[in-house]
């Protein structure tokens, strides 16, 4: 275990994973803030508890926040799995740093541009992150 913790590739992976986990927590918080700000709830008990409006449809601002959150849930856990396998498979420190930091920065930028409705930047950031995971997956298969 000590050997793994002292491995530079693992340290990079762990740092990036922690940053992405915090980012996911902040995205969930952002969704909650938007729900509270608009006082719109799809659960009647929440509407009652927070003196808000109950409805079957999400408020557009909340729906946008939920799409950002869902996008994270579709992409970041894949990084957690593939990145860990890649590091455990013996990735070099430099290759691990390149893939992990590229993915992490792409996801942080994706978050910013998604919050601000900026296309084509959102698609570009998504694609950069996608290629990072794909690159690690291919390296795992080839090793």
Q: What are these model-derived regions, one by one?
A:
Residues 1-30:
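Long, highly hydrophobic alpha-helical transmembrane signal-anchor segments
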Residues 29-67:
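Cytosolic, membrane-interface loops and tails of multi-pass inner-membrane proteins
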Residues 70-85:
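Core segments of transmembrane alpha-helices
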Residues 82-93, 141:
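Juxtamembrane "helix exit" motif at the C-terminal ends of alpha-helical transmembrane segments
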Residues 106-131:
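Interfacial loop-to-transmembrane junctions
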Residues 22-38, 108-111:
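Transmembrane alpha-helical segments that form the membrane-embedded catalytic/substrate-channel core
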Residues 93-102:
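Structural signature of hydrophobic alpha-helical transmembrane segments
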Residues 136-143:
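Juxtamembrane boundary at the C-terminal end of a transmembrane helix
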């Amino acid at each position: 275990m000590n050997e793994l913790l002292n491995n530079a590739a693992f340290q990079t992976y762990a740092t990036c994973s922690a940053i992405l986990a915090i980012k996911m927590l902040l995205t969930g918080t952002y969704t909650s803030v938007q729900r509270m700000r608009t006082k719109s709830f799809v659960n009647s008990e929440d509407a009652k508890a927070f003196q808000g409006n109950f409805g079957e449809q999400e408020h557009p601002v909340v729906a946008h926040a939920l799409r950002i959150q869902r996008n994270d849930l579709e992409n970041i856990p894949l990084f957690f799995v593939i990145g860990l396998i890649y590091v455990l498979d013996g990735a070099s420190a430099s290759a691990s740093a390149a893939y992990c930091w590229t993915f992490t920065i792409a996801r942080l930028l994706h978050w910013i541009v998604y919050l601000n409705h900026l296309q084509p930047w959102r698609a570009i950031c998504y694609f950069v992150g996608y290629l990072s995971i794909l690159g690690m997956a291919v390296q795992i298969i080839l090793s």
